[in-house]
C-alpha cells in the first residue's frame, strides 16, 4: 500500500498457503518466487533436496516456545513429564531437548501429538492436549485473548540458539535474475522500517489478505516481533546472517 515494491518495479501479490500446503514446496517447485517462513521447516525442506536458498533473515532470534494453560499446573520443565504436546510434522524435536533436560526429562517422557496447523489452539483450549509447541507471540496471545491465561516456556531461555523466520527463494531465481532478488530484499527492508512506526496501519493490509485475523491482536503480536530485532546480530546490518548462527541452526 505504501508503494515500496512498486517503486522497485515489483507487482507484489501476497498469497497465503492453503491448509496443508508447505511454503517451501511452493517455492522449491517454482510455483511462487519468494516465501517467508520458519527456519526449522526450511532446513528440513532444504535437506530433502528442494532447491531453495535464504536471502534475508527476518528474526535473528527464534520465537519458539512450549505454551500451556496456567490451569494445567505445568510451571517448570520437570512438570512436563507425561504431557501431551501438540506438534507439527515440520517441527524439529531436538529444539526442545535442552528444555526437557533441564527438568531431567527426555523426549520419551512426553507424548507428541501430530496436529494440523491451525488446530493446536483449539485443542489446547479444549483440553485435548496439555501444551502446544508454537510461537511465544503467536498462539500464546491468541489463547489469552480468548480468555485462557497461559504459561510460556521460550526455548531460547534454555540455550537454544537458532534463527526465527526468514525470506527465501528458488536457487534458479538468484542465478537467472539476481537483480529481482536484490530489489525484493531492498523493498522488504524499507517496508519493515516503515511498519515499525505504523503497526496498525500495516496490519490493516494483512487483515485484507487474511480477513479472519483480529486487527488489535495481530498488532500486539507484531509489536512483540519487533522486540526480536533488538539483537546484537543486527548491530551491523538488519537482516544480516552469520555462518556461526546458521551452523547452530542446522545442528539443532
Cite the ranges covered by each PLM segment:
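N-terminal secretory/targeting leader peptides
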Residues: 148-150, 211
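A generic alpha-helix surface/boundary motif
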Residues: 39, 94, 137, 167-168, ...
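A glycine-rich, aromatic-flanked flexible loop/lid motif
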Residues: 155-163, 221-224
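Short, glycine-/small- and polar/acidic-enriched structural segments
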Residues: 1-137, 152-153, 160-161
